[in-house]
């Protein structure tokens, strides 16, 4: 269920931004992830990480309202041009894949125990960026917190720590930053769009054999 809620939040944020900036959804998705991370980080610097989480939810609600208003004014033309794109379909497929693939996932890699899983649990426990908490049990305090902040948003929406959520968040975040490559794809050239989509899923494995 958390995956569906995160998907709705990310798509609402990206959809509102796409119609506001008159850009295709796949071009705005990376900005949506950056906004989710950036807002939480800004609040987290002052020790208000929960407030940052709720601020992001407020932005999602505001973006959803903007999306509805813009669609009422622009009609189905804007919907087809900016939102119902091949890139949006790829992102939707990625969320479905993340939902199904990590249902029984458990942390087992050494770096998951030494950092990725541990830092998220500390972030949830202290409700703060762990690098600034003396009592936090983390090894690498100098790691940038962006990935963990996106996983924190995901985990907060799920209502509790789930070992599959950090992997879901990380992989969705990676794909979101690759997705602008889909901006030139069109439904009438579905073969080209399919090849590009497959390439985007394969690309992370070229640099990390443990991807996915």
Predicted feature descriptions by range:
Residues 4, 30, 89, 193-194:
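Hydrophobic alpha-helical transmembrane segments
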Residues 10, 14-16, 197-201, 205:
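Specific aromatic-rich, kink-prone transmembrane helix
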Residues 1-80:
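Membrane-embedded, hydrophobic transmembrane alpha-helices
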Residues 99-192, 196, 208-210:
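Active-site lumenal/periplasmic loops and adjacent helix-entry segments of GT-C-fold
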Residues 45-55, 107-110, 207-212:
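Membrane-interface catalytic loops of GT-C/OST-like multi-pass glycosylation enzymes that act
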Residues 82-102:
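Internal/C-terminal transmembrane anchor helices
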Residues 37, 93, 190-202:
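Transmembrane alpha-helix segments characteristic
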Residues 71-85, 149, 156:
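Low-complexity, intrinsically disordered, cysteine-poor segments enriched in small/polar
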